[in-house]
Amino acid sequence: MSTQYSILFKQEHAHEDAIWSVGWGKNSNDGSELVISGSLDDLVKVWKWSDERLEMQWALEGHQLGVVSVDVSPSGNIMASSSLDAHIRLWDLESGKQIRSIDAGPVDAWSVAFSPDSQHLATGSHVGKVNIFGVETGKKEYSLDTRGKFILSIAYSPDGKYLASGAIDGIINIFDIATGKLLHTLEGHAMPIRSLTFSTDSQLLVTASDDGYIKIYDVQHASLAATLSGHGSWVLNVAFSPDDAHFVSSSSDKSVKVWDVSARTCVHTFLDHQDQVWGVKYNRNGSKIVSVGDDQEIHVYDCPI
């Protein structure tokens, strides 16, 4: 039980190249927390968090090119990785074995996200389409067309109603999953949308852009609730805390920032990375944050709860 933000652990030389994506998983055998990292060294690594440190469990081989996105299923036992090799791979977190490989087509699968029911996997594409694959079958089931530019980021709302996509031209689209219809187009940013995240109650959407700003949108009314500045450069990743009180952001300014959602202010800045920070995530109970970056390090931070 911590009363302040602090760095708990640094895993140096975690990969042999930049680490662009990170997630938390769970080992259902012993209940231990896992950290999953995806790197431009073509590897996905699974780390066990125990005794306040990370121990590598597996280095998962299979991708032919850099791994740019990883996501853990809400059920917690399956992990997906997408790579510049245009393949999505599904992995069993219990055994470290590959479940299947999905050919995402002639376009590279940039970001990958599980649906809240763990049944589907969404990935953005070059041609402005979000492709939805069945987790069980590995087959493409349908597409959502933004009729826009290359999609860099995607997110499902936790209630399963919406899917949001962020494009290289700064346009955000929100789809109704049940009907496949495009509900809202948000034009608040002028530069690429690197990341977006829904609040746990699905009411808010937070977006991160190369323009250096973070925006908070009211999902239902598609209205801009706040614009936050503080990072000195591109904002590369955003993620909500499980209780919706905070969200965390990472940037090419080498910092990780924690924001108070209701006060719309930054409450803490971590300056522990030596290079741009590509990935950041809260664990399932909000007690810890993990971050990864170009410095090939994984950092775990303690949060007051």
From Swiss-Prot:
Keyword Repeat among record annotations: yes
Any single Gene Ontology cellular-component annotation: Cdc73/Paf1 complex
Cysteine pairings via disulfide bonds: none
Subunit comment: Component of the PAF1 complex. Component of the SKI complex.
Record GO biological process: negative regulation of myeloid cell differentiation; nuclear-transcribed mRNA catabolic process, 3'-5' exonucleolytic nonsense-mediated decay; rescue of stalled ribosome; transcription elongation by RNA polymerase II
Protein name: Superkiller complex protein 8
PROSITE patterns assigned to the protein according to its UniProt record, in alphabetical order: WD_REPEATS_1, WD_REPEATS_2, WD_REPEATS_REGION
Function: Component of the PAF1 complex (PAF1C) which has multiple functions during transcription by RNA polymerase II and is implicated in regulation of development and maintenance of embryonic stem cell pluripotency. PAF1C associates with RNA polymerase II through interaction with POLR2A CTD non-phosphorylated and 'Ser-2'- and 'Ser-5'-phosphorylated forms and is involved in transcriptional elongation, acting both independently and synergistically with TCEA1 and in cooperation with the DSIF complex and HTATSF1.
CDD domains: WD40
Family: Belongs to the SKI8 family.
Coiled coil: none
Gene3D superfamilies per UniProt: YVTN repeat-like/Quinoprotein amine dehydrogenase
Localization per Swiss-Prot or TrEMBL: Nucleus; Cytoplasm
